[in-house]
Amino acid sequence: MSEATEVSIELKDIVQEYPGKEGAGVLRVVNGVSFKLERPSIVMLLGPSGCGKSTILHMMGGVRPIGVQTPTSGSVLIDGKPCSEAHDDVVMVFQRYANRPDLTVEDNVSFPFRLKHWRKRVAAAEARSRVDATLKAVGLDGHRKHLPSQLSGGQNQRVALARALVLRPRILLMDEPFGALDAQTRTEMQTLLSEMLLSNPCLVVFVTHDVTEALLLGDRVITLSAQPAVVADDFSILEPRPRSALWQRSSEALKMEERILAQLHAASPGRGSLRVSV
C-alpha cells in the first residue's frame, strides 16, 4: 500500500445563489453548509437529485461558472488555506468520462503528462511506469491501443478513473461517476474503486443520490437536504471495504438506510428523489 498523505478539505458556512429566471430575484441552491473532511477515506455526499451536491463538489475542485460569484458567501479551505481555483492536489472524475475520441486508451490515460505542468512534476520514465501499472490495475492492459469507440461504457469509465489515479492525487472528486452504467457494471466499478484505493490512498469525495452506493463505498456519509441544501445528517461507517453482499443485508446496514431516509424526509419532505439499488 502506498503511504497515505494527510489532507483536509473544509467548507465554512457555504451559501450559493444564482440569478433567478427573468430577473425574479435569486435562487438559493446551498444554504450554509459546513463540514471538514480529513485523512484518506471515501466520503459520500448523498442527497436528492438536484439538491446542490455537484455545486458543492465543483467548489471543492475550483470549478467556477462564468459571471457568478462562487461561493456567494463562506469559504472552501484545502489544508487550511483558501481555495478559489483549480488546485494541484485535486483531480475530478465526472459521469461523462470525457475521453478524447481520437486517442487510444494508453494515450488518454497518459494525456495529463503531455501538459507542461505535469511534465515538470513527473519524470518521463516515472510517467510511463505509472501508466503501465494503472492500466494493469484497472484491467485495460490488453486494450491500450483501442479507441474509446471500441470500448463499453464501463471500460470508458475505467479509462477516466485510470487517468485520474495515474496522477496520484491527494484529493479525488467524483461526480456520480457510475450513475449512467448498468447495475452489473456499476457494481464492478464500485468494487474496482475500493480495491484501487487500497494501493492509491487519497481523500475521495463521491457525489451520489443512491443510498445503497453510499453505504457500500462510504467511510463517512454526509446527507444533504433538498434545495436549498443543508446538512441533514453526517455519520461514519466502520465496516471495512470492500463490503460484502451479506453485510449490505445486515441489520446494521438496514438501520443506516432507514436513518438516511428518515433524516431526508424530515429535512425535505416530498422534494427531490433518491435511489435505493436492489
PLM regions: where:
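A short, proline-enriched helix->beta-strand linker immediately N-terminal to the Walker B motif
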Residues: V166-R170
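ABC nucleotide-binding domain "signature" region
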Residues: E126-V138, R259, Q263
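Short coil-to-helix segment of the ABC ATPase nucleotide-binding domain corresponding to the Q-loop/switch region
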Residues: L103-P112
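Helix-to-loop junction immediately C-terminal to a conserved catalytic motif
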Residues: G61
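The feature captures the beta-strand-to-loop junction immediately N-terminal to the Walker
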Residues: L46-P48
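Conserved ABC ATPase signature
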Residues: L147-L151, Q155
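Hydrophobic anchor residue at the start of the ABC signature
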Residues: L161
